[in-house]
Structures are given as structure tokens and as C-alpha cells.
């Protein structure tokens, strides 16, 4: 199966599907259609009925081959790649039997070094796909697409493997947070699903952050600095004051595990006006609400010193911890856990310090945990995919549909 995985991942990663957060269309970029149309064609060649809507959501069905009435399971992956780094002219490189030593990426000065990326030490002996140092790889999440496609191919070639109805979904714009926004849960018509969008071997994730964005706008009064005493209000300094009142230890670079944070993403302005953009994250719903409350309290504390209330705050929720919707349905986690155990894969159920499409889909009525893909260092030139771990991910998909047919 390795050769098929390499071939398919190479073909998909060389198609530029970068999304654009500034766009208002869905998909956010026309080039995402290039991969969507290819996948539609390949699914049809496998004999699967497909449904590609005007927003770039591609659904397909592998019909049940058993008489029993068992739950319909879905497998999801996103076609877009991150806007954080160059995604054009991707030139995948293959490392056979990785020796665990630093590896120079193409003709660049970039080096894939286990001292910097210690997870590489667990991949000695694996076949890796890496970049040439000039682009990201796009294994996030084209590895997930490959794994789903190869699992479907295998099931088609092995009709003796019993399974219920399987729904497949390939979606746009996950990297800019819009993946589920126009996802039609009723049209997808699955009882539950799994995103193939994790990273390291053994990841099985069903806890995500609660997430919000806070935009703070500071309005100043700009007068000539020579006569500014008791008249000027410097919006930039108001912004600095605002940020200084947040806990210095509760930032991404000083937190881990279940610890939440405030993250200042952008700060720009002039004396007249300054804008601060934060993301707020916490796994615990009560702490999440307290974090948002703290933002409002700081606004009020600063505004209390002025007559015209110069600091404005706009907070918008982005997604919530999917555990709230998944934990009441333990069989959704028990199924992959049984499969992992059968395949001798150690299950890592640590919470996601982020979110997936499943974070939103779970609150839309489609409970959706996340499973590993075997890739790492997403969104940049050091991205890699372990073909060996990808092969295990394919086996997990096959094992899940077998388990559902046998035990439900």
C-alpha cells in the first residue's frame, strides 16, 4: 500500500489549494475546486455516487454490503491548505528508511532536525514525505484525504470485509475556520463521523478548546505634541495598557495541556485609533466565560478614567469544546479505541489545543472526533508525512467500519 499512498499524496499535494481569509466566497479560493473536481472524478471511477454542491462540499457514499441495520459512519477531511506559508509549486521529497539524522530540505538552508523536532526520533526507519524547503507540504489535510480514499479502494477490492453505509466528505476552508459553515448535516446523513485531521501516531481527540475572538478598539485624541498636556489621548498607549492588564502567564508560549490563554494576534494603530485582536481559548466552559468577562472588566476599568469611553470591545464566539457533545455518546470513542487496541496502536486522548471541523460539526448535530494522520509541523516548510503511519491510519478506517458492522 505504501506506493499507492506516496503516489496519491504526491498528486494531491502538488495541487495548490491554499485558502484565503480575506475572501468572502465559499470556497475562499477558486483553486480549491481543482482538487475537489479531481476527487469527484476519482470517487465516481470507484463507482461511488457523489454530490458536489455550489459551496465546494463533496459528499460520496459507499453503500452497505450487509443486511443488518447499523449506524452510518462518516469520514471527513479538508481540501484547503494553510495561508500561513507558500503553498504553490510544492515539490514533495521522499526519504526512504529515515535514519534519524538532520535532513537538508532541497537547496534551502532549512534543515529538518530531530533536535528541533524531537518527534522525528520516533520515525526512524519510516518512509517520509517532506518539502524542498520552499513551501509547505499540504499533508494537512491531504494525508487525511489520501487515507480515506485508500481505505475506500481497499474496501472495494475486498468485498469480504463487511461494513454498513459509509459517508465521505471533503470540505473547503477549514484552515480559515469556515469548514463547517455551509456543511449540510442533513444532506451528509451520517449518525456520527471522524475527521482524519490529527497529527501524531495514536491521536484520538474528542476534547477541543472553547474559542472566541475579541477585537478591542481604542479611540484617541490627537493634538500637537507640543501642546498635548491634559488634552492628548494616545490610542496606542491605551492598547498597551489594556494588554498589560491581562495575566502575563496566560499566553500560548507559557501554557500547555488544559491551560487556557489570551493570545494577542495583531496590534496596530496610531495616536487617533488602535486595534488589538485577541483569540481566547480554554477547555473549561466556566473558565472560558470568565476569560471573556475579564476582557470586559478591563475595558470598564480603563473607560472609568475617561468621559467619552474610548475603549470598545467586540467579542464573538468561534467554536466550543466538542467533548460536551461527544462524551454523552461513549460508543463513538469506544469504537476507535477497540480498533487501536486490535492494531496495537497506543491511544493518545490528550485534548486538542485548538479546534477541528469536528468542534463545530459536533454542535451542529454530527458528533465528530479526530483521528491521527501521521503528519507533523503543519503550516510551514518543515511539514512532513510518515507513509508508515498513514498506512496505519488507513487500517484504522477499515477497522472502524468493520467494528460497526460486527458490534452494532
From Swiss-Prot:
Cofactor note: Binds 2 Zn(2+) ions per subunit.
Annotated transmembrane regions: none
Catalytic activity from the UniProt record: Release of the N-terminal residue from a tripeptide
Keyword set includes Metal-binding: yes
Sorted UniProt keywords: Aminopeptidase, Cytoplasm, Hydrolase, Metal-binding, Metalloprotease, Protease, Zinc
InterPro entries: ArgE/DapE_CS, Bact_exopeptidase_dim_dom, Peptidase_M20, Peptidase_M20_dimer, Peptidase_M20B
Class of the enzyme per the UniProt entry, highest EC level: hydrolase
Active site, UniProt feature: 80, 174 (proton acceptor)
Binding site for Zn(2+) 2: 140, 175, 379
Localization per record: Cytoplasm
One GO term (biological process): peptide catabolic process
GO CC, alphabetical: cytosol
Cofactor(s) needed: Zn(2+)
Single Gene Ontology MF annotation: tripeptide aminopeptidase activity
EC annotation from Swiss-Prot or TrEMBL: 3.4.11.4
Binding, Zn(2+) 1: 78, 140, 197
PROSITE patterns with a match to the protein in the record: ARGE_DAPE_CPG2_1 (PS00758), ARGE_DAPE_CPG2_2 (PS00759)
Keyword Transmembrane helix listed: no
Broad class of the protein's primary localization: cytoplasm
Superkingdom: Bacteria
Family according to the record: Belongs to the peptidase M20B family.
Role according to the record: Cleaves the N-terminal amino acid of tripeptides.
The protein's name in its UniProt record: Peptidase T
